[in-house]
Amino acid sequence: MIRLAGRLAALIGALMLPAAAAAVAPAAHQIRVRIEPDTRFLEGRDSIRFDAPRAATLVLSARFRVDSLVVDTRRIEVPDKPADGFQRITLPAARRIDLGWSGTLAPLDQNLDHRHTLSYAEPASGKQGTFLPSGSGWYPAVDESLERYSLELDLPADQRGLVPGRLVEERLAHGRYRARFEFRQPAEGIALMAGPYRIEERRVRTAAGSEVRLRTYFHPEIAGLASGYLDSIAGYLDLYERWIGAYPFSEFSVVSSPTPTGFGMPTLTYLGIDVLRLPFIRATSLGHEVLHNWWGNGVYPDYARGNWSEGLTTFMADYAYRERESPEAAAAARLAWLRDYAAMPPGDDAPLVRFTSRTHGASQIVGYNKSAMLFFMLRDRIGEAAFDRGLRAFWNAQRFRIASWDDLRRAFEHASGQDLAGFFEQWLDRTGVPELRIADAHAVATGAGWRLSVTLAQGAPAYVLSVPLAVRTAGGEITRRVELSRERGTAVIALPAEPLEVALDPELRLLRRLAAAEAPPILRDAMLAEHPRLITPTADAAVEAAARDLAASLLERAPAERKPASMQLVVGLHADIDAWLAREAMASRPATLAATRGSAQVWTARAGDGHILVLVSVRDAQSLAALSAPLPHYGRESYLVFEGARMIERGTWPVKSWGQVLH
């Protein structure tokens, strides 16, 4: 699986493979490719072989010219190519196809921000780096087919490059760097990376007894980070081999990109230079990418029936690290998932079974967070031991196969002895999440203690739920699970001491819509807003221009003036913001964000009519311009303080920690 923080939406049609493709023997490519980054020239030859004669359609970018095409022993004339997009070359049944092609790659755009990188699908090259995404048509891919390959790469002597797979040999001679790679497992495509890299290598013996080659391909300015990254990779391999099973490949590399990318693919991850510099990446995102070599690159999602791999990887990586940190950190992670979901406009929601890739914030909330919460609830239901048995059984049965949510369900059913059809159906096939509330709660004294009656209510059609209820009594806190399968149900709980308060799911163990008191406004509310509005209460033209740039960077939808605003982004100098708040009779600047602290303060608030406000108060236009790049990365925060582009303080507004008081 080739992932760009998921997959490129523009390439889904080209890369999505039906399950039937698994039944057809993969095409075998023998590719030789030469790249000249100075001129962005690419020249390649590919010999494609099939186990038996078959018709095939080749997909190649229209930016390339087909120099030669031979099908078995017959030379074929190629139809005129389109001006842009892809050439689709349909060929008769054959065992072998030989094709030569050449052309000019797109220029490397180092000005792309993270969001635009998600939708950039061109094969690009330059002195600082070359990246040819698997679905960009840089080589003649066989449509609707898995592929095996051998690839020989030819680059100038000051460049190094790689593709996913096993490094067979590399050499430096006659002013050229040459390397040969093999990928013998069925793959969904081939991506190629190159750059002025310095390579560091380490060989490790894994828990399963295999020798794995670990490498970093880093630009010179971050070469000093290599040793720490190699240490971390080795640790993650050990963790996941013990949890799931043997690492399925012979190597793993971390490769730096001059643009803010976030790709994961078999045997490697491709991350932006600035991302790799971040101190927390080794403890978070790196493990996520290593784990994808089991889920996504070792077992392939059946995209036609939903991508389960991002949620499972998020649960076993990002969330698992928080769980190992502390119960409080794990609960904070679950709160962040549910708070993100609460920020998503209802029209952006979709059933989890339809998720294929991350293309925007809403798809990440569904495909990563909602999916990870499903696995958390599943583990709660069947127990950790059965959950882990199910994971290992799924891995052993589906290794290098295309697998669906149904295959996962069957593995967990066998491991737990439970029928999980209803559980998976309601969380996969339905749009939305339960909206739960305590409709009534009262207690009466009995001879043996107290009897608490709690009536729970949810919307229609009802979910089948096991709802945690926490009761604070005069003698301490007691937790019970209450089964709810209708729109309304009453549970009676016997207690040894007088109940004082009752709370619905205070530990956030259910996927549900948070109540308003549980979901303080966060920056994500602005980023995903359906009808955002930009307000600039300033006479400074430079501030107005920087505010428009910030809105373009931060918001997923362009600000509009004609529709009623669901969110207002108010941007100005410190004095302008204070005056606007007073004029609109809004609450003044929070005490925690004094105007003298930092060059910029950002905070969220809720207006009297319920819509969200995001206020950005800055020292000057330069301080505002500095926010465009970093601010979109802090969607889960309620307030932030910046000094230039550096975040110096952040936090979320407090939430109500308990539930209904009993009288």
What are these regions (language model features)?
Residues 140-287, 310, 315-318:
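Hydrophobic helix-coil surface modules that form long, contiguous segments used
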Residues 61-118, 174-175, 484-498:
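A surface-exposed beta-strand-loop module
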Residues 184, 280, 310-377, 381-382, ...:
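Acidic/His/Gly-enriched intrinsically disordered linker/tail segments
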Residues 66-72, 420-421, 434-505:
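Beta-strand-rich binding/interaction modules
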Residues 364-454:
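Amphipathic alpha-helical substructures
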